Structure formats: C-alpha cells, structure tokens
Amino acid sequence: MTTADGKRRGVAIVTGASDGIGAELARVFAARGHDLALVARRADRLEALADEIVASGAETRPLVVALDLCEPGAIDALAKALDAAGARAEILVNNAGFGLVGRVDRLDPAEQFAMIELNVRALTALTLRFLPAIVAAQGAILNVASIAAFMPGPNFAIYYATKAFVLSFSEALTAELRPSRVKVSCLCPGPVETGFQARSGFALEGKMGAARLALISAAEVARQGYDGLMAGRRVVVPGLMNRLIILVAGHLPRGWLLPLMAAAMNGRPQPDGLSPAASSS
C-alpha cells in the first residue's frame, strides 16, 4: 500500500467493519477516496466487503485484518499488519463494540467484563497506539458511541455506561488535540436496524413510540458520521428524533427519567437472565 514514491500510504482503520454501521462506514470512507484497513473477527465477511469495495471502483484493495481486539497482543498484531502492508494510520474509526440486555445480577459477569474490555479498554488502547501517527498526519478519529451516552440505561446498565465513557473521552480529546489539527468526533446514533438488537436480546420489532420513530438506517448513520467528522463536529447525532430524545433526557429529573428508561427497555431481563452478545466486532 505504499505510494509511488515509496512512502507509507495513509489508511482509515475501521474496527467492527464486518457488518452494520462499521461496514457502512467502510463503504462511505472508500467512496470518498480513503484507503482502508478493515478490522473484525470474521475474516470471511471482511474479505467479502473488501471485494465489494474494489468492485465499486476503489483503486486499492482494503487491507483485511481479522482479529479479536480483546485478545492479548491484538493491537500489536494490527500495528504489525499495517507495517507489513506499507500502511500507516491516518484516520481511526473506533466502531467495534457490543451490548447485553438484562439485570446486571442476572447476566454473566465474564460477558459484562468483556463488554467493558471491548467498548472501553480496546477503544482507548487503539487510540493511544495510533495517535502519534494520526497527529503526524493531522488526521482524524471517529469514535462510535450512542445516544445511550447521554442517559442511564436500566437493564442495559453497563452498555450505557461504556458509551458515556466514549463520549466523555472523545470530547476531551477534541480539546486536547485541537492544537495538533486532529479532528475528533463522537458519533451517537439512536436505534439502527442492524444485527445488534437481535444479538443483544433487544429487538425493535413491534415496538412503538420514540424507539421506532427514531429508527434510522446504518447507511445514513455512516454518511452523517463521515460528514460530521470532516466538518470537525465534536458530537454527531443522526436524526431529529434522536436529538430531541437527548434534549428531553437532559432536562428531566433523574427520578422521572429512570422509570421511563426502564419502561423503554421493557423492564424485563431475558428469561434465563443471559443475553447473547450484540457485537459489531
């Protein structure tokens, strides 16, 4: 992936690129002329996406790096893969993550710690590892959080808390890195029809009210996320309804908001107390 003069080619690293918002972000970045490094666990899906991007007219085939970001040494392995391909980090898209729905005392503790590991520690480690190269390139970082970052989430407690971390971390980075001319944006989508809901045990089928009205496609979320990043917007919330939800949540007393959020999550854990991981990794 080196350039004609032998220099390392700058790439946009997209984690959780195998499906959903991550795959759509990869498509948008490719369509806007960025070379890519696609990261997720499922090599077959990444290869298929890379083939699709080439078929759509990309000059350079995306680098495919299949790994689990929670495994020891995974980020070192990603850095080595970039180096071996003659690539360097210019943009980092931290999209990989997953959620679990249910009461915290009825969920598998190991799965809950794995959620923190991916949603918080891996995102932070990726940022710290590739930040020197991104600063040198005056590049950009897009962290994918959720409107969950703005409110507590009964029956989704740890997931919501991890997204609050992502938002706070991103906003602080925006200020810290402004002198370096590095753009940092936090993308905060609401409900999106992807595999997330089915695998988390929280499906939107049959639901009414704000959750349904706020529904937006993964492709539109990705487009707005990219445009917001390029425009230097600190926080990007796709959809008017999602922005209204955040506004209302920010003004309601917590004593009113908590039962409303519990009702929105149905107030019911899964029958066996365990929910499969909702993953974009």
Regions found by a protein language model. Name each.
Residues R32-L49:
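Conserved glycine-rich Rossmann-like NAD(P)H-binding loop of the short-chain dehydrogenase/reductase
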Residues S18-D19:
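Conserved glycine-rich cofactor-binding loop
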Residues S146:
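Residue(s) in the substrate-gating loop at a strand-loop-helix junction
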Residues N95-L100:
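Conserved NAD(P)H cofactor-binding loop of Rossmann-fold oxidoreductase domains
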Residues R103-V104, D108-A114:
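Substrate-binding pocket helix/loop in short-chain dehydrogenase/reductase
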Residues P179-N242, G255, D272-S281:
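SDR active-site lid
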Residues T127, T162:
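Active-site helix of classical SDR
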